[in-house]
From Swiss-Prot:
InterPro entries: Aldolase_TIM, DUS-like_FMN-bd, DUS_fam, DusB-like, tRNA-dHydroUridine_Synthase_C, tRNA_hU_synthase_CS. Its cofactor is FMN. Its EC number is 1.3.1.-. GO terms for molecular function: flavin adenine dinucleotide binding; tRNA binding; tRNA dihydrouridine synthase activity. This is Probable tRNA-dihydrouridine synthase. The keyword Protease does not apply. Keywords: Flavoprotein, FMN, NADP, Oxidoreductase, RNA-binding, tRNA processing, tRNA-binding. Pfam families: Dus (PF01207). It is an enzyme of class 1 (oxidoreductase).
Length: 328
């Protein structure tokens, strides 16, 4: 089971979802090292991109080791989206992904994200302008629709294909749902049936059973994993292996999870600097440690610390007895 996105062949049908504040360079690097068909940047505003805002440029930094990497753009002006796409192509992006799915109020009020599912004419102009501006493939991520009375993802997928889009990902919720309720994977079958380009299913893919059901119900060509990778950068690789072989690999042993956490922690400090790195690291440390004994107290203590060496030592001290218990 493989996915072809224009001229690019993915190693496997698993994509790391774009997630604001999560899929930065250190996290993408870890996921790609473990194994993942495609990693996607955090969503970036096209206006900030063409101004070459320093923070925005850091968010879309590409490494050869992460190939293929997609940069996700949000915006409502076709010419600006096109210019931002070209800038990212020049900076090494392998794929441009267009965001028609973000439900956040600030984005929607700016007539971007899922707001564009309510304006198919403007959506088409954005899709066409972006696809024509670059030589690399352009993809689209969207939701079922704005609400249950406007489930227009199949129609918008057809428009996207006509505009030159090479792959569509659908999150199985409406904008009105945000992340509430459960993802409707079966609806995505209607999108798959509407187009000839690959379709990827997204939403609530957090386990092997979910992978089975999502693919069976949607008929999709692949899966996009978002929150299922929180604290588990190895999960996309497990899913890749499972789809390829049918074998459900266990999570890495706890001492390897600790090594991964510390590698990630050091990478965040290097990428953001001490203060910024600690701020970003706290949520990841929380996700990694979820489910371990006394993890709530551990997270609370980490959140009060400001010395990076003290945090590193505290992480080791917290994991040590758990690793000993696992080895006993």
């Amino acid at each position: 089971m493989a996915i072809q996105i224009g001229t690019i062949s993915l190693e496997g049908p698993v994509i790391l979802a774009p997630m604001s504040g999560v899929t930065d360079l250190p996290f993408r690097r870890l996921v790609k090292q473990s194994g993942c068909g495609l990693v996607v940047s955090e969503m970036v505003a096209s206006q900030a991109m063409i101004r070459e805002n320093r923070q925005t440029l850091r968010m879309v930094e590409c490494e050869p080791e992460q190939f293929p990497m997609a940069v996700q753009l949000a915006g409502c002006e076709p010419d600006v989206m096109a210019e931002a796409a070209k800038l990212n192509e020049d900076r090494g992006a392998a794929i441009i992904d267009i965001n028609f799915g973000c439900p956040v109020k600030k984005v929607v009020n700016g007539h971007a994200g899922s707001s564009l599912m309510r304006d198919e004419a403007l959506a088409a102009r954005i899709l066409e302008a972006t696809a024509k501006a670059v030589t690399i493939p352009v993809t689209l991520k969207m939701r079922k629709g704005w609400d249950d009375s406007s489930l227009n993802a199949p129609r918008l997928a057809r428009i996207a294909e006509e505009c030159g889009i090479k792959l569509v990902t659908v999150h199985g919720r409406t904008r009105e749902q945000f992340y509430n309720g459960t993802a409707d994977w079966s609806f995505i079958r209607s999108v798959k049936e509407a187009v000839s380009i690959p379709v990827v299913v997204n939403g609530d893919i957090t386990s092997f059973d979910a992978v089975d059901r999502a693919l069976a119900e949607s008929g999709a060509d692949g899966v996009m994993i978002g929150r299922g990778a929180y604290g588990r950068p190895w999960f996309p690789a497990q899913v890749m292996h499972y789809i390829r072989t049918g074998e459900r690999l266990p999570d890495p042993p706890l001492h390897e999870q600790l090594d991964t956490l510390l590698e990630h922690y050091d990478a965040m400090l290097t990428h953001y600097g001490v203060e910024g790195g600690l701020r970003v690291a706290r949520k990841h440390i929380s996700w990694y440690s979820t489910g371990l004994r006394d993890s709530a107290e551990f997270r609370s203590e980490v959140n009060r610390m400001s010395d990076p060496e003290r945090v590193r030592g505290f992480i080791r001290d917290f994991y040590a007895p758990a690793i000993e218990r696992m080895a006993a």
